């Protein structure tokens, strides 16, 4: 807080990756287009499924299950409907073909995230994230990512890793103030 009691936020360097050349057709990531242009709320406008990780240790799996339960409860209050939730081991190719995936965990704790992690623009580890060559670490950090799904470029993948976003956001803005890819 400053002397007036207001919160001030200072950022010396942006945490976003620099813009590059537009990718050629068929390149990864695919070009933005109608239905795959962001922002993150677009991932929730179509059919989606929430996926909790089961590949971690027992404590991690319980923590992820609790996060998913809390997120699903908040979504229910926000959208007046509980989202479908699957374990990572229950996700089939048919699910990947038909739905946007909302993944919770890290590549070490979520089997689906482990399958596509190498094709995401960030590196995700326990309490650490690498974006555009910069590493951010800490026990209270979290990350939310929306990106074309490498397993189905016609759909999105949304990743929640670490601490949940929006602890102090009202329920009406918790899911619509996040950026796009």
What is the predicted function of each stretch?
Residues 1-181:
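Solvent-exposed alpha-helical segments and adjacent loops
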